[in-house]
Amino acid sequence: MEWPDALPSAMVLFPSMFHDSPPDGHCPTFPTADAVFSILQPNHPNGLKAQLTELVASFDASPQNPTLSGATIDESAGPVIVEQSAQIEPGSHLIGPCYVGHHAEIRHAAYVRQFSWICSEAVVGHASETKHSILLPGAKAPHFNYVGDSILGTGVNLGAGTKISNLRNDGGEVHLRMNGERFGSGLRKFGAVLGERCQLGCNSVTNPGVILGCDSQVHPNTTVTGVFPADSRHG
């Protein structure tokens, strides 16, 4: 599937992943020829599902047993892999396959579902839920957040109650809106791609198919739709 050339690439949205020293632990490899959200395609040969399945299979066992910290796990569909330095709080629940990186935090009542890739120093906080998503190093979903079928760049912070909507009400293909035009993503479930250091205020919502460039800000109680460049302001 072809997408407009004007869509921001992974190198534009996540420059530290390409130019800085590699972070501790494991991070996914992003497409450079396809649209950045192609990694969310369920059957993509190098998509999130394929890469995470390969990653968790490379471990003989999880470096940390999260149940010793009071968490519960479900490995009926795949392993739950947690690095030894990660902080896992009581009452959290993790479903495999999933990966939690070095010094990441999974706080009380967090719900980490299948194909969640939580990179080093990322946070899934109290009453927050992730599913088929990537939180790059230092990304935070700390309080009452939902992150589904999405990518949060390094340094992204979601304010309390922020929700990333990933499914249209009619269940149809998610479309992206950019420069007054609308085009299909090829995905039925697609939340948002948030470039590095984006800040979303409390109780904000991103509609399905949002892409925000680096350092964008969303004010509290604001709903965002579309594709926007770096440093955009909403609300």
Predicted regions and their residues:
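Terminal amphipathic alpha-helical/low-complexity segments used for targeting or macromolecular assembly
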Residues: 1-71, 215, 221, 230-232
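Glycine-rich active-site/cofactor-binding loop and its immediate structural neighborhood
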Residues: 76-115
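Tandem repeat scaffolds
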Residues: 100-103, 118-121, 195
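Glycine-rich hexapeptide-repeat left-handed beta-helix
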Residues: 27-29, 39, 126-127, 132-235
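Short, solvent-exposed loop/turn positions at domain surfaces
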Residues: 74-76, 94, 112, 146, ...
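Conserved short histidine dyad/triad with adjacent acidic residue
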Residues: 62-64, 83, 195
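Periodic small-residue-enriched repeat registers in elongated scaffold domains
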Residues: 116-118, 139
